[in-house]
C-alpha cells in the first residue's frame, strides 16, 4: 500500500511515548505502540511504518505543548522529520469528543487533529529565544528568593516584637531602621545574615535587569520591545516573557 501522508500522533511523557498512525484514506488510527521516551524510538517507529505505507510515504509527527518543551521537536527536525507542536486549547477533536483519558486515546486525538488540521501550531522559538527565556527564568528565581527573604525578615521582627512605625516596608527609611536594630546575642547575627542575603539578592537582580535591558536592544527584539514600552508600567523583563 502507498499513502501520500501518514500522521503520527505522539502522547509524550517523561518516561514513555505512546504512538499511533493515521491516514485520511483509512480514517482511523492504527499501529499503536508504546516506547521509551527517546526520539530514536520514534525514528524506529517511522521506519516500521515505512514497511507498511511504502518508502514514498510522508510522515508528519505531532505532540501537545506541555512540560516536554521543544526538545523532541528539535531532535526530530534535526533528523529531517516534520514535527508540529499542537496548542491543546485549539484542538477541536479533543474539545468535542475526548471522554476517557488514556495515553492511547490521546495519541489518536493528536493524530486526527493533525490530519484534519483541527489545531493551531505552537510558535517554535529560536535557540537564542530559548537561551533568553532561561535567563529570564533565572532572574525570576532570584526575585522569588528575594521575596522569601523579605518575608523571613518581617517574620523575625514580628517574633521579637520589633515594630516599624513607618508607612511602607523596604524603603530607604525601613532598611535604615532594620540595620539600626540591636537584638541580643545570636539574634543580632541572625538579622545581619538575613539583611546580607537581602542586599546580595537586591544587587544581583539590579544587575540582571540591566543585562535584560542590553538583551532587549538586540535586532531580534528591539522593535517589539520599543512598541510595547509605550504602555505605562510595562517593564522590559515583562515584555520578554
PLM features: residue spans?
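A detector of single, family-specific signature residues
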Residues: 1-239
